[in-house]
Design a protein with these regions (language model features):
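Chalcogenol-based redox active-site neighborhoods
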Residues: 1-134
Length: 134
């Protein structure tokens, strides 16, 4: 279990290789990954409704893995739906995708949740915003 007995940052986003996800959200956590660790965070996890192969390639292409971010795919959207963070946008081909959010989880309990009002925004859920609340 990735969360038991640990302090973990999870940030969810609509999709690998998509605009804001690649240019704003992931980079915000790449910039702050070391600072989170200095504040006692055990892991920073990026979660997207994609398969693990896409997430591994995206990790390599963005350098997120080298920055210490664990890139996880929620291929069936089971976790995303389970926490109520799924949305559909059929005009752009998004079905059961993740809303954009960031959270701090302490021993399996969400202690901070920052959810964007729109998947095209990346301010409330950015790494710098979450870091400032710790």
């Amino acid at each position: 279990d990735l969360l038991a007995g640990r302090k973990v940052v999870i940030f969810g986003l609509p999709g690998a290789y998509t605009g804001k996800c690649s240019t704003a959200h992931v980079p915000s956590f790449m910039r702050t990954a070391d600072a989170f660790k200095q504040k006692g965070v055990d892991a920073v996890i990026c979660l997207s409704v994609n398969d693990p192969f896409v997430m591994a390639a995206w990790s390599k292409d963005t350098g997120a893995g080298d920055a210490g971010i664990m890139m996880l795919g929620d291929a069936s959207a089971e976790f995303t739906k389970g926490i109520g963070m799924d949305f559909d946008a059929p005009p752009v081909g998004f079905v059961s995708r993740s809303k954009r959010y960031s959270m701090l989880v302490d021993d399996g309990v969400v202690t901070i949740l920052n959810e964007e009002g729109s998947p095209g925004e990346c301010e409330i859920s950015a790494g710098e915003t979450l870091l400032a609340t710790l």
